Amino acid sequence: VHYIRSRMGEEPASENETKALIRIIQEYDGRGLLTFAQSGREIIYYHCQQGVGSLPKSYRLARHMQKSSSYHLEREQMTESAREKFKGMGTPEQYYIQTKKQPAFRIKVPAQSGNGRGVEEDKKAVYEEIHLLPLEYIFSLDN
């Protein structure tokens, strides 16, 4: 048990959550990946590091989602030094776009502030802002 715990996070797919996510991505075909995170109001679109084949499609879909929301659009940027530092490591979006060659996006929603009733109101406001984004994505695939 000590060996397993000391190695977690040091090798690709060493955490159970990561293994499960990789298995899902490998087993099921999809038309894209949307992930959600807290911190800002952004839609980040990812591109293949080896080529630009899916970049125009990713940009077009991201632009469509941006028009449906009040979120800022960002292209995933990775400097050369960061690529070397994190070689072999990556985000679910990077893994998905590299293996499936389909668009991937991270949607950053505002972080919750305060305690009590304010938190519930914040959650409801964020939900109102983003609840249609997955549907907008699906409907824009064939356009």
Regions found by a protein language model. Name each.
Residues L33, E42-L55, F86-N143:
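Active-site-adjacent mobile loop/cap segments within catalytic or ligand-binding domains
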